[in-house]
Amino acid sequence: MLTSMSTRRLLLAAGLALFGWTFAPAAQASADPTAFIQEVSSKAITEMAPAASETDKQRAAKLKPLLEQYFDMPSIARYMLGSYWRKATPEEQAEFTAVVTDFLALAYGKRFASYTGHDMNIGRVRDEGDGRTTVFSTVQLPNGEPARVDWTIQAAGDTYKIADVKVEGLSLADTHRQEFASVINNNGGSVSALIEILKKKVGN
């Protein structure tokens, strides 16, 4: 199942953090990883400002370039496919990477048709080694409850790429990895079956 309650909450909180927050400065705001998260969110706010006439597909089309620019989508796609990545053909790997980007763009984008913004506080930054850093933050959900959002970012030259987002300990990458594995298992181990299901989800 590709739209479980936990997944919807995860996408909502992560999406609010990326695309709908008003920045509240923290003590480590000058740190490079923090500045990167600020840059991503500032760009997203500009690009994803709600427009009443926009369709879900139009919002997804605006969001997709941001995912491709700021997220390490090739690595994320490979992780989400798990052990099936090695079993997939190069053509299937490329096709899955493309369609899962479309899927995430649609899943995030459709939640912000009328969203006006909530506060997010960026807190401490932790060096994980091997070029990886975790940026800890808290975002306010529409119901007023706070949610912890942790960003795992990977050094990429003179900038960073987002490798994963965790909401209250739930990993975006892990959640989809489990869902996709279930779909593949239910279709006789076929990666192409998952690809076709995702294509239908995004209308391709």
PLM feature segments, named:
Residues P146-D174:
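Short beta-strand edge/turn micro-motifs at domain boundaries
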Residues F23-A29:
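Sec/Tat signal peptide C-region and signal peptidase I cleavage site
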